[in-house]
Amino acid sequence: MLERYSSQNHIYQFLERKTRDTFPRSLLLIGESGCGKHHVCDLIKNKLNLDMQDISENLNFDFLMQLYERPQPYIYIIEASKISVKEQNTILKFIEEPLKNSYIVILAENSNQLLLTILNRCQKLIFNPYSIDELRSLTNNELVLKIAKTPGQVTSLLANNLEDIVALSNKIIDKIGTANLPNVLTISDKLAFKGEKDKFDIECFSRTLNYLLVEKIKTDNNIKYQEMYKLVSDWNRERKAPTVVQNFLFERYLVKMHELMRN
């Protein structure tokens, strides 16, 4: 898949040149959600002909010590969005003293998700922005093309009921200040915080709400919409923390938006 996008040629060429002997023991892939980080992991797995294991949920010292005792080499995947600062400190030894014949690949949406000590010890591959023409090869839906920034985001938006997500987002923007608070809090019930299939995908919802707020700000100079945009941005940043209770966090920001637009 990756090779079809000229904007990511540098990543494909990097992988083509590498062998087991020359591949970095600690690699950091940085790019927006849906940019292809997991696809690159599959390419690495095939290139190195090794088994791959996501260890994001098991990052404690005892578990990492068990990995040192494994006789067979592995590719270990760590997702930055799923680990705490304490867990990042734990994996420093893992990075500084690599396992024999094994490799670590860390996935992050941006460098701010990781400690500087980790950033400095990993080789980095950064995804370039995708062009509108590259994304247009996936869809002609103009609204999707205005919202999405990566192929994965295009696919996700197309798979969801975008019309209903837009309606919900516009309802928040236009009416959250006049609705009563109990009704406002029911918005949380519509989002798939636990991956529910019959609810709206959180990533699709957040990107759509962001886009529609930007469009609103362009046509309405009410400073409250700029403040609402900041609240949504803060929510998007905070919800990336691995230990946050997603629905409680979202409800807290719904209350803030309700109070902002009510006054």
Spans of model-derived segments:
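Conserved alpha-helical scaffold flanking the Walker A/P-loop in AAA+ ATPase domains
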Residues: 13-18, 58-76, 81-82, 86-94
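Charged, glycine-rich active-site and insertion segments that engage polyanionic ligands
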Residues: 1-49, 100-103, 109-263
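Loop/turn-to-beta-strand initiation segments
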Residues: 71-76, 99-105
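"Short basic amphipathic alpha-helical interaction patches in structured regions
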Residues: 89-95, 107, 119
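Conserved catalytic segments around the Walker B and adjacent sensor/switch elements
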Residues: 47-57
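Structural motif
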Residues: 30-33, 55-58, 78-82, 109
